[in-house]
Amino acid sequence: MMPSPQAGDADIALLLEGTFPYVSGGVSSWINQIIRAYPQYRFAIVFLGSKRQDYGTFRYPLPDNVVHFEEHFLYEDVQRGTQLQPMERQGDPQGTALVRDFLAALAAGGPHAPQAMAAFEAVAAQLLPGGAIALEDFLYSRQSWNLLCQIYRDHCADPSFVDFFWTVRIMLQPLWTLARVAQALLPVRAVHCASTGYAGFLGGLLAQTRSIPLVLSEHGIYTKERKIDLFKSEWIHDNRNIFQRDPAELSYFRQLWIAFFEWLGRYCYHRAD
């Protein structure tokens, strides 16, 4: 692997999920072209991947105006999170209240309501290290457990609580990794996301917490691509019996994953300039 440049600041942070410099063609090609077309700007690249083993070596040499490179593998962090020492925690009442406010806003006005986005932003800001919604509380607190049980009873159409529990954990835990990345990222003047998804959430969080411009280039329409992947995926269970299933209806867990990626996209578009 090529040595990674490090810098104290940069002009533009490129937030790249599963693309340049590890994957050739497509998105990576035009990212490479953009960087080389603007030699007057100093770029910082934040690469987001699934697991380190899923990527080989760089397919592109980093241009000279890439002054900083860092990489984060979100599902390796999920595995590390499950290795945290479980211990009794009550949770932060402020953080729990913010999550409940978000759920209430969703129920009252739907996902497109302005109050739902405002409540989501309040939750996102508290995911940062030192915030009221700590990863340890999400994983182990009594308040988190009670809230999870309530959501399962009120909304889950799948009979398996075990699958619901682990789906929610796996789905949401990368957001705390991204919040840590957002807080630790070097100073930049602007942020550019090649897509929505996890990179888009990181971009939205940086724009929100640092008040810097966010540019979004939707290549391939990320959310639709994720929907196609979710329709095809065999690892998402449907535990309903033949009498409970509606052939015309998606399974609950597929709906949950789709709603999650739609929210990441909605947040990024809301914050983009």
Regions of interest found by a model, annotated:
Residues A7-D9, A44-A179:
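A conserved catalytic-core segment of Leloir-type glycosyltransferases
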Residues E17, L48, E218-I221:
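Histidine-centered beta-alpha loop that forms part of the nucleotide-sugar donor binding/catalytic region
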Residues G18-S29:
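A short, glycine/small-residue-rich beta-strand->loop->alpha-helix junction that serves as a flexible
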Residues V27-Y38:
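Short amphipathic alpha-helix
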Residues I31, A199-L202:
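Short, well-ordered alpha-helical microsegments
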Residues A113, Q183-Y198, T209-V215, H219:
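Short N-terminal targeting/anchoring amphipathic segment
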Residues T177-P187, Y222, R240-D273:
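Membrane-proximal helix-turn-helix segments that form the acceptor-binding/catalytic region
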Residues L214-E234:
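Short, solvent-exposed beta-strand-terminating loops
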